[in-house]
Amino acid sequence: MKDSAGIKRENKTQIWKLLLSGQAYTKQQIALQTGLSVASCNTYLNEMELRGEVIGQKQKLHDVGRNAVVYSLNEEFESTLCVFFQWIQGVKSITTAVLSPTGNIRYEKTKSFSLLDAGVIQGEIAAVLEQFANVSQIVVGTPSIAEKGVIRHSDLPELENVPLKPLLEERFQRPVILANDMHYKVYGYCRQEQLSHQVVTLVNYPSGVLPGTATVHKGVLLTGRNLFAGMVGFLDYGMSLEQQLEKLHRPTAEPLIVQATIALISILNPHRLVFTGDLLEEGDLARIRRACQKCIPEEYLPEFVFLPDTRDYYLMGMYWMAMDRKENRE
């Protein structure tokens, strides 16, 4: 049974979740949307406004009539710092972005490095925090497995076995979320496209590195026991990893892509397969689908979708995971 403090936190969270949309609401509208009484909303909103979390502004709701106070989240109250690094077509880069409480991008920068180790990551984060002291969470995306805060099987060898999560939390004294880049991308895709009732798998084939996939099953991200779920680069293709990497170029990659796609459909039975990565073009999907039909009946094949760029979904996936954590923490 929840105590009064727990009920209060839960009710405030309901209001906060409603205001995440970025829209402004009156107390009466908030009460209607949340099921709370107007008196309770008044109390909670006053407390949240005093803390600086929300802003109340007078606004005329109709052409005639009295002004009403509408409430929205304060975009300056706190920020989320998103950090991701990658190795694409031989270029190592790190991107830092600061997102407001409603997911608006307030700052974004990408820099390339010949060596991208933990020191570089810390330096880039420190530079951003000098500008945005109100960052309350740091969300990090890695092209690797991120088991227990440690980077493993990384595309960037200088980050192999680095305990990045505890390292960053110790230095910057803020909570850190560290996860595989594909997890953020597919989660952001499902949240932004409002696919909470579907099974969606994102399939990524970049050049020069092993492929990866990630799946959201009706709103729940499937990560597996060791956060290893979706690592199709480790399927048995009848060759070593080195030989597989040699084949991961156009057009020799396509048979490997077909094999992985058949495995994904058979095991996950998704509504939608979303293909991305520079080894794929939109015209490839019809051939891949025809190849899958040789093994899987047409009625069990999912929708095939080509996504040329995942960057926006990546950032929004990081944002939504940060918001989920905030909701569960408060």
Predicted features, each with a name:
Residues Q59, T110, N226-L227:
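Short clusters of small/polar residues that mark proteolytic maturation junctions
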Residues T80-F84, Q137-V139, V199-N204, G212:
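Short glycine-aspartate micro-motif
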Residues I105, I151, L221-L222:
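Hydrophobic "anchor" residues
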Residues R174-I265:
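Glycine/GP-enriched mid-protein hinge/lid loop-to-helix segment characteristic of carbohydrate kinases
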Residues P143-I145, G208, L279-L280:
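Short glycine-rich anion-binding loops that position phosphate/pyrophosphate groups of nucleotides
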Residues E108-Q192, A286-C295:
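Glycine-rich phosphate-binding loop and adjoining helix at the ATP-binding site
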